Each structure stands twice: as structure tokens, then as C-alpha cells.
Amino acid sequence: FVGDKYQSIYQFRGGVNAMDVIPHQSFPLSCSFRYGQEIADLATKILQKADPKIKITGLGYDTKIVKGSEYNDDCPMLFISHSNVTLLDTLIEAYHAQVPTVLMSGKAGLYLDKLNSMIEFKEHGTPTYKPHQKYKDYKRLVFSERDSESTTFAKMIDENIDNAKELRQALSWSLSVVPEKAELTLVTAHMSKGLEYDTVMLSDDFFAAIASFKNGKPLDEPELNLPKSAKSLFLQVGDG
């Protein structure tokens, strides 16, 4: 019987975590052939927040961990953030720098449709995204559409519409990038599980999530998974 009590499937309504229900003697897996000891040590530090007994051994490629500010290579990179907000901010920066960038989720087109519609609704009262056309006004849309991207876009539009328009341009530009030729691929931690990339950068927005343990706030289980970097893991941290 093999199981993983941290799998998201157990969070579905009515889902039962078999690892907590069935009496068993547990033998946790403690070795990984996907990365070396440096990443294994980092994984251990993070996972011990959930279970102090965890100890990971890296038996794979001798992976290196360095500060993001020291990155000077030009190989394709996977950028992983804790939140969608950081991901979209990074897309805008990449657009300004003209670094070919794509969203791993494949949702750039959907995001563009929603964002453009919300901007047009706010400024001209003419939503362009069909599901938005049922609302009488922009405020009603914002009140009713509570998915994460709509909430993010509404906040951006209301706080700084010029920034929202920059994101609109960045999303449109990203759609023209061929994924195989992208130098930067953006993904959230939740969607990165199972991916393998030679070069990975972790955003600095993970530190707030990990620090939340000190205040007794649980970190979402899916975020406890580290990327399967084969060669290099870059941490986006400040010098302090």
C-alpha cells in the first residue's frame, strides 16, 4: 500500500485521507534520484515544518543552489512563484526586457480575454468577454466574479489601470512566443509538481509563506513540493 497524505486529492469535498484512516506501520520514502544533496537539504528544512522526522537524501545529479542575483547563464529557465500575482508581475518585467516568456498553465489567452473585457467594461461599459456581458455594470461583475484571476485583475484595474494595461500588452506579447523557444517559463508551485527542468528559480514570495509557520498558519499542502530541478536551483533572495 503506497500513499501520500499530502496529495491535493484528499482536500476535495468528501475525500478521505486513507493514510490517516487505515492503521499502518509507515516507511516514508527518504531518497530521491531527481536531485543532489543540496536540494535534498533544502527540501528537508521545508518539509520538517510539516513533520520534524523527515530527512531527505539526494542521490541524483549534483545540483547547485545559488542566489538568483548570481545567475549569469542564458539557458532556458523555469520560474516558480507561490502566487499568481508574482507570476504576472514577472511577466510584465519580462515583457519590458523582451525576454521570450510563456505561462506554463496555457491560460495566457483566457487571462487576456478576461482582463481586456474588464478594462473595457470599466472604461467604456462594453465588456468583450461573453460571460461578462450578463452584468449590468463593472461593479456588479467584480462583486460576482470571485475566481482568483478576476479578483486579481479587479484589484489591479482599480488601483492602477495603467499597470493593468501593461499586463494586457504583456499577455498578448506572450501569446506570440513559441513555447519551445521561450527563455523563461512561468508557473506557480501548485502547477509545478512533477515537472523536470535543468534550471529552476524560486521566487522570493515563498519566504512569506514559509514564515507563516511561526504564526501558526498552515502552508497549503501542495506548496510543500519542491521542483524536480536536475542541475541548478536559483533562489530569488535579497542580500540581507
Regions found by a protein language model. Name each.
Residues 120-240:
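Conserved helicase C-terminal RecA-like lobe
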Residues 1-67, 74, 78-96, 104-113, ...:
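Conserved helicase motor core of SF1/SF2 NTP-dependent helicases
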Residues 113-116, 121:
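Accessory recognition modules or surfaces
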Residues 99:
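Short phosphate-binding/catalytic loops that engage adenosine nucleotides
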